[in-house]
Structures are given as C-alpha cells and as structure tokens.
C-alpha cells in the first residue's frame, strides 16, 4: 500500500469521513464505504487555541484511529453517528479523543481559558456541565484527562 497524507477543511473526524464519501456519486457509496473503512489508518484533527497567557497557541487535537470498530461504523451509515461516542470510550484503549476532550484537558492543565475552550468546542454545553461537576452515566472524560505528571498528548 501507499502512505497518503491529506488535508481536508472540515470541523471534525465525522465530517471528514462524510466529506470523503461525498467525493463519489451516491450510487457508488455502498462500494466506497468498505474500501474507505479498510484503507483508513486514522484521522487527526487540529484546532489551534490561544494560550492562557496570550503568548501563543496550543493544539487541541481530535484523533480517530482505524481499527475493527471504526471499520464497522464507517461501513454502516446507521452507525456513523456512534463514531464520536467510540472516540470518547476508546481513549485509553485506542488513543482516540474528541476535540472537546482535548479542550477540557487543556483547561484543566491550565494551558487555555475556559472561554476559549467553549468558543472552540464542538459541544460547548458538555464542557460547561463537566466543569460544573455534573457527570453523565459514565464519566468518560475522566479516564482520559491527564493527571499531574502524565500526558496522553504532547502540548
């Protein structure tokens, strides 16, 4: 195979895979989905966020790793909406993360201001709830947010 790196101007990993599919006529989508899913190594998204001290920018990253679960979701249009949940749940096992997870970690590490995180978030209300201490049924973000002395992402 060949290593292909490309840039697409999209807002997140889900929009990226949808954009890739939209490059083909609709009558070819059922043929393209399996090909795309088996050939996709991963998607890395990047948003540059102003630092808390205003001296530069720090990357907030979104990572979707190509694996069996990703392939399954990419092949089935009904499961495409589950990709974001998989990215949150697969953080410790696969190294995946959403933009919002990365933004929250940057806030908690003191790298960026909460206001900047909310302005750049895909789902700002989820970050507000998390910062207010309101938890969901599973606290997926806590499994990813680095503790003092550890880091999942170089910042």
Describe each region flagged by the PLM.
Residues 2-155:
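Short, flexible helix-loop junctions that flank or precede catalytic/ligand sites
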């Amino acid at each position: 195979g060949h290593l292909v790196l490309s840039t697409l101007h999209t807002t997140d990993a889900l929009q990226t895979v949808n954009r890739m599919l939209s490059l083909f006529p609709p009558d070819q989508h059922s043929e393209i989905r399996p090909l795309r899913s088996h050939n996709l190594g991963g998607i890395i998204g990047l948003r540059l966020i102003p630092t808390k001290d205003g001296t530069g920018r720090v990357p907030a990253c979104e990572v979707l790793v190509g694996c069996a679960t990703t392939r399954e979701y990419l092949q089935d249009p009904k499961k495409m909406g589950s990709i974001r949940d998989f990215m949150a749940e697969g953080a410790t096992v696969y190294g995946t993360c959403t933009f919002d997870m990365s933004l929250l970690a940057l806030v908690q590490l003191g790298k960026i201001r909460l206001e900047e995180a909310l302005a750049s978030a895909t789902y700002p209300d989820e970050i507000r709830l998390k910062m207010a201490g309101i938890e969901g049924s599973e606290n997926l973000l806590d499994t990813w947010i680095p503790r003092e002395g550890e880091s999942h992402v170089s910042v």
